[in-house]
Design a protein with these regions (language model features):
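Intrinsically disordered, low-complexity polar regions and short flexible loop motifs
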Residues: 206
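A long, amphipathic alpha-helix that forms part
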Residues: 1-20, 30-32, 36-79
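Alpha-helical packing segments of well-folded alpha/beta enzyme cores
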Residues: 3-7, 129, 220, 224-228
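Short, glycine/acidic-rich hinge or "gate" loops at secondary-structure transitions
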Residues: 15-23, 144-151
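Beta-strand elements within well-structured catalytic alpha/beta cores of enzymes
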Residues: 4-7, 20-29, 103-106, 129-134, ...
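Generic beta-strand/beta-sheet core signal
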Residues: 23-26, 34, 91, 107, ...
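C-terminal cap/loop subdomain of S1 sulfatases and analogous C-terminal strand-loop tails that border
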Residues: 69-100, 112-122, 126-203, 220, ...
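Active-site-proximal N-terminal segment of extracellular/periplasmic enzymes that hydrolyze or transfer
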Residues: 38, 211-219
Length: 236
């Protein structure tokens, strides 16, 4: 956060703030991870190192200890992480919308054609920054790099949305993270955990993913699963 503030101050001082495209977003929903021996313990190596050094790490939410220092690990656990993402379902490390759907704030007074402070519910993805920046810069995606042929990018430009237009996006977005998988295509999303069955949600009517339509619309599930298998194979 300090670095962002430093950058913004420099843009203001050099009078480049109005015509600089700034997009600010985070990578996932609220974090459920605990620093403990139970549940998700991705940071347990920190505990081992501290114990070996004869130090104690303050874990969780300690009212009498300022959290954020090198010997603290603030965490809220699964239940509160889910609550923090209300009304979305689940949390970080999961590809339900509570873990994978986050807001993006855009600042570009000289270029945006939308009303200041307005909210667009149109879909975008971090991969779309490639096509967006290429279009804004008037640049061409390279066909080769260091003597090797580059692979085509899978990015869709967000510029039409920045210009205030409504874009019909039928592009399939593929998610695979920490044993959870999803495909988002058009108004629909399939999602599963591990090797469990695929659930189907109609995001246009059920963005909170509470009504599983897999049994009512098996053909759509099959169609979307084929996208997954084409990308990852049947065993993944």
């Amino acid at each position: 956060d300090q670095a962002v503030g430093t950058l913004l101050e420099a843009l203001k001082k050099t009078k480049r703030m109005e015509n600089t495209f700034i997009i600010y977003f985070h990578d996932n929903g609220a974090c459920p991870e605990h620093l403990s021996g139970n549940g998700w313990n991705t940071a347990n190596n920190i505990l081992a190192k501290a114990e070996k050094a004869g130090k104690t790490i303050a874990v969780g939410d300690k009212y009498d200890i300022p959290m954020g220092g090198p010997m603290t690990y603030g965490s809220v656990g699964h239940n509160w992480a889910n609550a923090q993402n209300t009304p979305m379902r689940r949390y970080k490390s999961n590809v339900h919308n509570g873990g994978a759907c986050t807001p993006a704030i855009v600042h570009w007074p000289a270029g945006l054609k939308t009303k200041p402070g307005s909210i667009s519910k149109q879909r975008g993805h971090v991969v779309d920054l490639m096509a967006t920046c290429l279009e804004l810069a008037g640049a061409k995606y390279p066909e080769e790099f260091k003597g090797g042929e580059t692979k085509p990018h899978e990015s869709l430009s967000l510029v039409p949305i920045l210009k205030g237009k409504t874009v019909d996006r039928d592009h399939a977005y593929v998610f695979n993270h920490s044993g959870t998988h999803a495909i988002v295509k058009g108004e629909y999303k399939i999602v599963r955990e591990g090797r469990g069955p695929w659930a189907l949600y109609h995001l246009a009517k059920d963005r909170t993913e509470t009504k599983n339509l897999a049994k009512q619309d098996p053909e759509r599930v099959t169609e979307m699963v084929s996208i997954w298998e084409k990308r990852w194979g049947k065993k993944k």
